[in-house]
Regions:
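Glycan-recognition and catalytic cores of secretory/periplasmic carbohydrate-active enzymes
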Residues: 1-119
């Protein structure tokens, strides 16, 4: 994921396969889980580039996914970076689980003084 799934802006692509990029859109849940996943890799491996990837993904989410006008996160950004108006913020398969979990998880990890190799 680190080598092939990240866009230049720090975000995670929606989907890739053996033949390459399939969907360059950005989904809220993938960005949220990438923050935790990359930070987890940093804690396990101690390699700073994973912490940097987590931070860049978080910065992307804050800059592009957070809906500052109506609240919550946009669930999907089109390939051109605009919010996908066809997706709901909440529904049978959409809820604030992933981004809430990422925030709680990162607050816990950043506040407990854990260092690489501490997991």
């Amino acid at each position: 994921v680190y080598r092939e799934g990240l866009d230049r802006d720090g975000s995670l692509f929606a989907e890739a396969g053996p033949t390459g990029l399939v969907d360059a859109s950005k989904s809220w849940w993938a960005q949220a889980e990438a923050v935790v996943g990359f930070y987890n890799a940093y804690q396990l491996a101690g390699k700073p580039h994973f912490a940097e990837a987590a931070a860049r993904c978080w910065e992307f989410a804050q800059a592009r996914l957070v809906d500052r006008r109506h609240g919550d996160w946009f669930k999907r950004l089109n390939q051109d970076g605009t919010p996908d108006d066809a997706t709901y913020k909440a529904g049978p398969w959409e809820c604030p689980y992933h981004h809430s979990r990422a925030c709680f998880e990162m607050l816990s990890r950043l506040n407990d003084g854990s260092r690489p190799g501490a997991l």
